[in-house]
A protein has these predicted regions:
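Conserved alpha/beta core of the MobA/IspD/sugar-nucleotide pyrophosphorylase nucleotidyltransferase superfamily
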Residues: 2-7, 168-251
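Conserved core of the sugar-phosphate nucleotidyltransferase
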Residues: 113-190
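Conserved beta-loop-beta/alpha segment of the NTase-like Rossmann-fold superfamily
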Residues: 65, 71-148
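Residues at the starts of beta-strands that form the adenosine-phosphate
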Residues: 6, 51-53, 75, 102, ...
Length: 251
């Protein structure tokens, strides 16, 4: 199999839970150790071997595109999602005509280590499946209530969702996808809306969703002042003073 060089990044949401520290910025541009969160995601993916990015934007997408236009180091194809108020599966569907084979799917607000993405990219993938990177270090999950949980049977995920009762790992927001995912999302739509988990749930029922354990790898989703502060500490970065003051006030 040829090396996978394309990543799709979902960056369309409005990030309302980070509003107290983001000011007027869209969430992907919120500062994390001197750089926007999205830039950290892209740098880590680039170090893992990604060369081509397809970034789906929606809320204040013009501001995000303008920021990266000033630094053309990344090869980016921008995709607009005017329906950014809908679930994230809709955002991924907007990218379907820009994908030309297996790809790495990332969230614009999930920080991770490059070696974790590199290890996922090395996994052999069939043309009818998706591989989800999962974390079984449950005691280390910062906000379990908000985490998307998975239940595995061997190498396969058999159930996925935030509310499932039986689980043994959590979804890290990092997927190795074959283009088949688009068909599953399309058939999962209800009222012209679907989440990634909706599509993954359909695949899990047919044993088409495999799990990849990140072992000692670190990651963190950043969707609130508290998780921003936690991620800064987890990755060894001091939280900027003015952010720290706002985080303390919001907790």
């Amino acid at each position: 199999m040829s090396p996978i060089k394309q990543a799709v990044i979902l960056a369309a949401g409005n990030g309302s839970r980070l509003a107290s520290v983001s000011g007027s910025l869209p969430k992907p541009l919120v500062d994390f150790n001197g750089k926007p969160i999205l830039e950290h995601v892209m740098l880590a993916a680039e170090e893992a071997g990604i060369e081509e990015f397809t970034v789906v934007v929606g809320y204040r997408g013009d501001v995000i595109k303008s920021h990266f236009a000033r630094d053309p180091r990344f090869n980016i194809t921008w995709v607009e999602n005017p329906d950014y108020h809908k679930a994230n599966g809709v955002s991924l569907l907007k990218a379907r005509h820009h994908v030309h084979g297996p790809f790495l799917l990332l969230m614009s607000d999930h920080i991770f280590q490059p070696q974790t993405a590199a290890a996922l990219l090395q996994q052999p993938i069939q043309n009818d499946e998706v591989i989800l990177a999962v974390d079984e270090k449950l005691d280390a999950i910062f906000d379990m209530d908000d985490a998307t949980k998975v239940c595995r049977m061997g190498d396969y995920i058999i159930e996925i969702g935030k509310q499932i009762r039986c689980y043994d790992a959590v979804d890290t927001g990092m997927f190795l996808c074959s283009p088949v995912i688009f068909g599953w999302l399309q058939t999962s739509k209800t009222d012209d809306n679907c989440s990634l988990s909706d599509g993954m749930r359909q695949m899990a029922r047919r044993r088409k969703l495999r799990a990849f354990d990140i072992a000692d790898g670190m990651w963190q989703d950043i969707d609130s002042p508290a998780t921003l502060a936690y991620a800064e500490g987890l990755f060894g970065f001091p939280l900027p003073t003015f952010f720290a003051e706002k985080v303390i006030a919001s907790v």
